[in-house]
UniProtKB/Swiss-Prot annotation:
Post-translational modification: Cleaved near the N-terminus by the viral protease during virion maturation to form the mature protein.
Protein name (record): Pre-histone-like nucleoprotein
Keywords assigned by UniProt, alphabetized: DNA-binding, Host nucleus, Host-virus interaction, Late protein, Phosphoprotein, Viral penetration into host nucleus, Virion, Virus entry into host cell
Keyword Hydrolase: no
GO MF: DNA binding
The encoding gene: L2
Motif Nuclear localization signal boundaries: 124-132
Propeptide section residues: 2-23
Length: 132
């Protein structure tokens, strides 16, 4: 994704994901900054440093209340790509640690199976509540 930094006359220059683009080779009234000599602003490097979100609901529920909370979250937001699934996939060798962070086909199958299980549990729980 690029950030467009444009002067008022809209001549358009900006920051790409890895480099600057557009602009002029010489400074002028139309281009107040010439891109080749421009440096990346200090705030431009902070995008990848944001901390991960803390989850309010445990991914490996132990108590009945935690199970209900997890199922409710799955019903609201869809099945999560659970940390538990990825850890289990690593243990069985379904996660290729040498490459970029991508699940192997076995890991994807395992994640899909876990998601299906959680959805089915939620459906069963709904049926049980309706029948009472």
């Amino acid at each position: 994704m690029a950030i467009l930094i444009s002067p008022s006359n809209n001549t358009g220059w900006g920051l790409g994901t890895h480099k600057l683009f557009g602009g002029a080779k010489q400074k002028s009234d139309q281009h107040p900054v010439y891109v080749q000599a421009h440096y990346r602003a200090p705030w431009g490097s902070k995008g990848r440093r944001r901390p991960g979100r803390a989850r309010g609901v445990p991914l490996d529920p132990k108590t009945e209340a935690e199970v209900v909370a997890t199922i409710d979250e799955v019903a609201r937001n869809g099945p999560p790509a659970a940390r538990l699934v990825l850890e289990a996939a690593r243990r069985v060798g379904a996660y290729n640690l040498r490459r970029a962070r991508k699940l192997t086909p076995a890991g994807r199958a395992m994640a899909a199976m876990r998601a299906r299980q959680m959805v089915n549990q939620a459906k069963r729980r709904k049926r049980r509540v309706r029948s009472k």
